[in-house]
Amino acid sequence: MKDVIKFHAEWCSPCRYYKTVWNEAKEKHGAVHNFIEVDIDNDNTGLAEKFGVRSVPTTVVVKENKDFQKQVGALAYGDLEKLIKG
């Protein structure tokens, strides 16, 4: 099981586009992976700092609580699929 984390903000235009792609992937893979959404303006978890998030949207996929891949920008559905499967 992987943690798929989306860092976003309400004021971010690309984040609004990406929400549709994210929800589609979450619907398809949500039973297998943990999908976590973090609003960087209200992040009291410290996750943005932990993963070095400097812009939104950013997607991080964590494998087995250690190795992770990070992609900055609003991804197309196929690119998000590759990141999750990678």
Residue ranges and their predicted role:
Residues 13, 42-43, 75-78:
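Short alpha-helical
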Residues 7, 26, 31-45:
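Thiol-based oxidoreductase modules, predominantly thioredoxin-like and allied folds used
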Residues 16-29:
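Typically the conserved alpha-helix immediately C-terminal to a functionally engaged Cys/Sec
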Residues 13, 23, 41, 68:
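Nucleotide phosphate-binding site architecture
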